[in-house]
């Protein structure tokens, strides 16, 4: 097991030091340039699509639409009043 680990470590170490292999693929300025280009493209795409304010992709609708009926639901009350009497550490019981 130790021999296998050492062999893999040496192979990776050798590959990193030869030109045109893993060391060349890890060119930091090039990867930073790609990241900056990706961010520029992303801002351009979002500018072209113009997503309206208040839109959330998680709900798939506008916040104003989902919160529109919130004040109306506060007006509704149960036709009867339920009184819950709870004691610490015990289950609650319903007394009408």
Swiss-Prot record:
A Pfam entry, by short name: Bradykinin
GO cellular component: extracellular region
Entry GO MF terms: hormone activity; toxin activity
InterPro entries: Bradykinin
Keywords carried by this UniProt record: Amphibian defense peptide, Cleavage on pair of basic residues, G-protein coupled receptor impairing toxin, Secreted, Signal, Toxin, Vasoactive, Vasodilator
Secretion signal, residue range per the UniProt entry: 1-23
GO biological process terms, semicolon-separated: defense response; vasodilation
Cell wall biogenesis/degradation recorded as keyword: no
Reported function: [Val1,Thr3,Thr6]bradykinin: produces in vitro relaxation of rat arterial smooth muscle and constriction of intestinal smooth muscle. May target bradykinin receptors (BDKRB).
Family listed: Belongs to the bradykinin-related peptide family.
Protein name per the record: Kininogen-2
């Amino acid at each position: 097991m130790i021999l296998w680990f050492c062999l893999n470590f040496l192979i990776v170490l050798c590959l990193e030091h030869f030109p045109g292999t893993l060391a060349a693929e890890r060119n930091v300025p090039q990867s930073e340039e790609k990241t900056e280009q990706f961010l520029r493209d992303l801002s351009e795409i979002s500018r072209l699509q113009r997503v309206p304010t208040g839109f959330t992709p998680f709900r798939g609708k506008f916040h104003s639409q989902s919160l529109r009926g919130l004040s109306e639901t506060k007006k509704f009350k149960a036709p009867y009043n339920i009184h819950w009497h709870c004691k610490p550490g015990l289950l609650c019981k319903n007394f009408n």
